[in-house]
């Protein structure tokens, strides 16, 4: 009979009853009496068990999954003994002595089990079974996970860092591409929201214009202030955005291209958070009415951040911010859109490319003419946006060769490795509708257009008979001449 006293921390001190309780805890209750009580297996004997002991007589467990589950659980016990520092128990490479070791490694166990859920529908109890999977790295988590199994059956699989890498680097399927797109979209959305919150923080600590006048700037000092310039810059940005999203909508590889857009924009704006927060520059123009707001509550800050985020930070939508100068977000977005239009349209569309970059240059000039940013803000924004776009695509187009020759690339470019490995690299710039639209034939050929058969009148019948007689007479004369 198994007791319910607490199990000692050191497995070497376990009695047979403790081994039986431990087997019940990991979901192997059906073998508790057989192993612990019938064959008198205590803690030390448990640590010495191998797969041969379990599958051969006298134990004779016939289920391979149960054998592996017990062996992996014993492996964690061995790890625990080593951590305790008990020199009486040596660490084995695996439960059976010929497999990979978890000692001093980042390997984990992938545990799959059936979890039973209880639902009440129309007053009746309904039980559903869901297949779950968890990665565990310690004994307590393993035991808790195995105990969740509703039917006592679980699958335990050793999963290593190399296995995770292989899963990420497998060729992309459609589902995997869409999943990456959703992750990239969530990443960019959180980055934009964080940027909006930082914009509120820097506005609350903007330097006083009376104490800190605008800094000397070689461009702003020589270009007069144009009040409507910034609104015109945002209008140009909207035009470029419409062009780009039209291209993206009809592009054959729209999922891959959209994923790259979101991942790049999210990364650049995440970098902008730090550059804005580290150093607060004075306002670039005396026309800007900027005052610090040091006493705002957290709720007010979050409300203002959501206002900026939901309106895309555009002054056309009523967003007014100060202190977010290093570096220019408008220049970043416009430059990134111009790069995407150029990269993902055919090379012979030179007219569109020229039009795009001319608008880009005008937009940058209008930002400076509006005195909304210093020249260094615009220059840094253009440089960072261009370099990030080119570096990311250089890696995306050659990721397989680069990563295969230098494993450190996974550490240096984790975002690019995660999103691009398994992808096809450079994509063909071909266009089509996102969905096939089939229009029924009857829409084009109405019943009114179909030929109608009407009864002939008497006069028309007579004319037809006369014409037929003449044709017969001509054919007979033609035959006589030949004869």
Curated annotation (Swiss-Prot):
InterPro entries xrefs = SAM, SAM/pointed_sf, Sphingomyelin_synth-like, Sphingomyelin_synth-like_dom
**Is Lipid metabolism tagged as a keyword?**
yes
Cellular component aspect of the GO annotation: endoplasmic reticulum membrane; Golgi membrane; membrane; plasma membrane
Topology in the lipid bilayer is annotated as: Multi-pass membrane protein
Residues of the region (Disordered) are 450-483
According to the UniProt entry, its GO molecular function terms are: ceramide cholinephosphotransferase activity; sphingomyelin synthase activity
Transmembrane feature ranges: 182-202, 230-250, 261-281, 349-369, 376-396
Q: Mind telling me what this protein is named?
A: Sphingomyelin synthase-related 1
| Organism of this sequence | Caenorhabditis elegans
Its ancestry begins with: Eukaryota, Metazoa, Ecdysozoa, Nematoda, Chromadorea
């Amino acid at each position: 009979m198994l007791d319910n006293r607490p199990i000692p921390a050191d497995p070497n001190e376990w009695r047979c009853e403790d081994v039986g309780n431990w087997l019940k805890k990991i979901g192997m209750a059906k073998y508790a009496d057989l192993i612990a009580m019938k064959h008198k297996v205590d803690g030390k004997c448990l640590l010495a068990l191998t797969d041969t002991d379990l599958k051969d007589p006298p134990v004779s467990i016939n289920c391979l999954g149960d054998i592996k589950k017990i062996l992996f659980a014993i492996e964690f016990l061995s790890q625990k003994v080593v951590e305790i520092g008990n020199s009486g128990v040596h660490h084995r490479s695996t439960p059976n002595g010929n497999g990979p070791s978890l000692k001093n490694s980042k390997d984990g166990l992938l545990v799959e089990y059936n979890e039973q859920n209880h639902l009440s529908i129309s007053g009746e109890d309904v039980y559903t079974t869901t297949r779950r999977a968890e990665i565990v790295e310690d004994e307590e988590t393993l035991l808790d996970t195995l105990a969740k199994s509703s039917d006592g059956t679980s699958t335990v699989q050793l999963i290593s860092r190399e296995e995770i890498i292989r899963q990420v680097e497998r060729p992309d399927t459609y589902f995997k591409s869409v999943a990456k797109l959703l992750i990239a979209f969530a990443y960019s959305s959180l980055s934009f929201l964080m940027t909006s919150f930082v914009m509120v923080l820097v506005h609350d600590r903007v330097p006083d214009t009376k104490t800190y006048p605008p800094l000397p700037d070689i461009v702003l000092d020589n270009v007069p202030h144009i009040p409507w310039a910034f609104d015109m810059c945002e209008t140009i940005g909207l035009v470029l955005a419409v062009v780009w999203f039209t291209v993206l909508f009809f592009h054959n590889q729209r999922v891959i291209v959209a994923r790259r857009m979101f991942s790049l924009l999210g990364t650049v704006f995440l970098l902008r958070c730090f550059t804005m927060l580290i150093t607060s520059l004075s306002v670039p123009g005396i026309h800007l009415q900027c005052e610090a707001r040091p006493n705002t509550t957290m709720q007010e800050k979050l409300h203002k951040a959501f206002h900026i985020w939901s309106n895309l930070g555009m002054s056309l939508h009523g967003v007014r911010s100060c202190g977010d100068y290093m570096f220019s977000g408008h220049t970043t977005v416009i430059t990134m859109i111009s790069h995407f239009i150029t990269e993902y349209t055919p090379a012979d569309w030179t007219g569109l490319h020229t039009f795009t970059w001319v608008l880009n240059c005008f937009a940058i000039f209008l930002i400076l003419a509006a005195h909304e940013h210093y020249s260094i803000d615009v220059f840094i924004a253009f440089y960072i946006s261009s370099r990030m776009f080119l570096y990311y695509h250089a890696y995306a187009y050659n990721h397989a060769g680069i990563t295969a020759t230098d494993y450190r690339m996974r550490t240096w470019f984790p975002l690019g490795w995660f999103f691009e490995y398994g992808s096809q690299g450079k994509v063909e710039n071909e266009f089509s509708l996102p969905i096939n639209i089939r229009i029924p034939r009857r829409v084009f050929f109405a019943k009114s257009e179909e030929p109608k058969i009407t009864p002939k009148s008497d006069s028309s019948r007579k004319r037809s008979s006369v014409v037929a007689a003449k044709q017969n007479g001509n054919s007979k004369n033609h035959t006589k001449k030949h004869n």
